[in-house]
Amino acid sequence: MILRSTLTSALIGGIAAFSLVSSAIAAPLKVDAGKSTVSAVFKQLNVPVEAKFKKFTAQIDFDSAKPDAAKAGVDIDISSFDLGDAEYNKEVLKKEWFNAAQFPKASFVSSSIKAAAGAPAGTKYDVTGKLTIKGKTADVRFPLTVKKEGNGQVFDGAVPIKRLTFNIGEGEWKDTGMVADEVTIKFHVVTAP
């Protein structure tokens, strides 16, 4: 009887401890695709152009109390790139630009998310990670702003890149006089509880 009572107490204690540990691990946040956007901003003939990626998925595991444990990943469907013109949209999918047939996805995986120095707690972070476009991977670093919105959170950021680092624009399109080398990938990701 004493053995049974001790075993039952130990089992209940173990289940309770497992429940506490499980609840302490942040669950991935649910991304609201209808409210979230990813776009690329660049200059063509010195005129600003913004194009949207209409299809992407994001995996975010984030707790503002433990930013060092946070993780983020984004997969972008390259064929969803929209310049607002069907002819241009077809052109950028070709080998000289994105080569979407061979490289249908671009991706980002974070390696570090740290609270930004001097910023109010839980609002600004420094993010580093690996960005892969057209089979080329490069380290990127960018500021991230996080704010509460209802029961969810909003993540905003801008990732500066050079398109030629990723071989975007081959042949005659390597000339940065037509299309600038500097590109900013902007994102606005809304999560729900």
Residue ranges and their predicted role:
Residues 1-14:
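Bacterial N-terminal signal peptides that target proteins for export
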Residues 24-193:
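Low-complexity, acidic/polar, glycine-enriched regions of mature
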Residues 15-25:
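C-terminal segment of classical bacterial N-terminal signal peptides
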